[in-house]
């Protein structure tokens, strides 16, 4: 369902509701890449800098350039402790300003499904990577109900409340990721999936953070308070809540990597 725009204008809130799960998936993604140290990286669509920080922490790059179209996100990214070593800029994933064959690794973390033209984005990744370099990406499996906020979105959909998902959500399947990478000219293309869980201390904790998400917040912020409470109650009924009242939230992402010929 669409009808509400997705905006990245609150990086602090994004980090609160998404940070734990993206840290888990991001670490597994970088381990899967098995990168060499002291290499040149570009983090395309770096958002609030979480992925850039993970690359710096786990991969010891000699150079890392990071770009995002949101000034708010870039400002927040620069405030992270480790990201002082990164080169941040405002940029378009489908029209990179980098020279051809500049990097050893080009990555997109939770980005491809937000691009109007994912094929163009992947082609740009391949263009800026050296021969033998690696291009890679991961996305929440939206069509496979992999979004962390999926329990809430299901209730909104059932009630006819408009909300938006990324515009190119069809790219989130394993087959679609493999196809777009192979069409870009990448070789030795591989795919995998990562699952992650987060434990919330209570349902109130879960709801408060979900309410801040870029998918839920725009859809419910202007609703009648009575309707919001009804949605809140219905979501709770569909969650895995243990005896102490903790909520176990699950998400899963699909990933792809390939080598530049």
Language-model segment annotations:
Residues 3, 22, 48-50, 169-261:
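Conserved Class I S-adenosyl-L-methionine
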Residues 40-96, 120:
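Class I SAM-dependent methyltransferase SAM/SAH-binding core
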Residues 30, 53-56, 122-126, 153:
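A structural alpha-helix within SAM-dependent methyltransferase catalytic domains
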Residues 5-20:
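Class I SAM-dependent methyltransferase Rossmann-like catalytic core
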Residues 119-120, 126, 130-201, 217-220:
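Conserved catalytic/acceptor-binding region of the Class I
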Residues 20-39, 54:
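Conserved alpha-helix/loop element of class I SAM-dependent methyltransferases that forms part
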């Amino acid at each position: 369902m669409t009808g509400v725009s997705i905006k990245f204008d609150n990086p602090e809130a994004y980090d609160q509701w998404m940070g734990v799960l993206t840290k888990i998936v991001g670490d597994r993604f970088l381990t899967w890449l098995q990168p060499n140290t002291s290499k040149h990286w570009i983090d395309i669509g770096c958002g609030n800098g979480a992925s850039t920080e993970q690359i710096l922490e786990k991969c010891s790059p000699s150079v890392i350039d990071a770009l995002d179209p949101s000034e708010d996100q870039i400002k927040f990214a620069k405030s992270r402790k480790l990201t002082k070593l990164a080169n941040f800029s405002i940029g378009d994933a489908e029209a990179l300003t980098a020279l051809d064959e500049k990097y050893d690794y080009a990555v997109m973390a939770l980005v491809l499904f937000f691009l109007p033209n994912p094929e163009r984005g992947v082609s740009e990744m391949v263009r800026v990577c050296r021969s033998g370099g690696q291009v890679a990406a991961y996305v929440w499996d939206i069509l496979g109900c992999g979004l962390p906020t999926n329990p809430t979105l299901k209730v909104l959909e059932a009630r006819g409340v408009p909300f938006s998902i990324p515009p190119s959500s069809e790219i989130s399947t394993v087959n679609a990721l493999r196809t777009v990478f192979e069409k870009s000219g990448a070789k030795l293309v591989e795919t995998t999936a990562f699952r992650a869980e987060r434990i919330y201390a209570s349902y109130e904790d879960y709801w408060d953070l979900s309410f801040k998400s870029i998918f839920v917040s725009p859809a419910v912020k202007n609703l009648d308070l009575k309707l919001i409470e009804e949605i809140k109650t219905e979501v709770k009924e569909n969650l895995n809540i243990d005896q102490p009242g903790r909520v176990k939230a699950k998400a899963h992402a699909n990933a792809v990597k390939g080598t530049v010929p």
